[in-house]
Amino acid sequence: SAQLRFEDAGITKRALDYAGKERNTSGEQIAQILKAMTPLYLAQYNMPELQNMVSAALNTYLDNPQNLTVTAQPPKSVPFPMIMGAAMGAPNTLPGLLGVTVTAND
């Protein structure tokens, strides 16, 4: 298994505020734009479960930035050639094959 975790120490609000200032709007508006655009951007990859999971986690995180976690925990060992085959032939199956989850504020 593998896990990538980001713990916010205030940088998210500062980054959103900075991005908003650069675009003559607020950090809150930038957060709303990100929340709206994320599902649209992810839809092109044809991974609806991952799209919904990422969108829900991002919405939760942007509403109250604490932490964001990406975990890959396959139910059983996955041989590397199987991962490569899925990546080349059916990339939309990778999140399920690898047991990918994306969560926020847990």
Where are the regions that the model predicts?
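Glycine-rich, small/hydroxylated-residue low-complexity segments
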Residues: 1-106
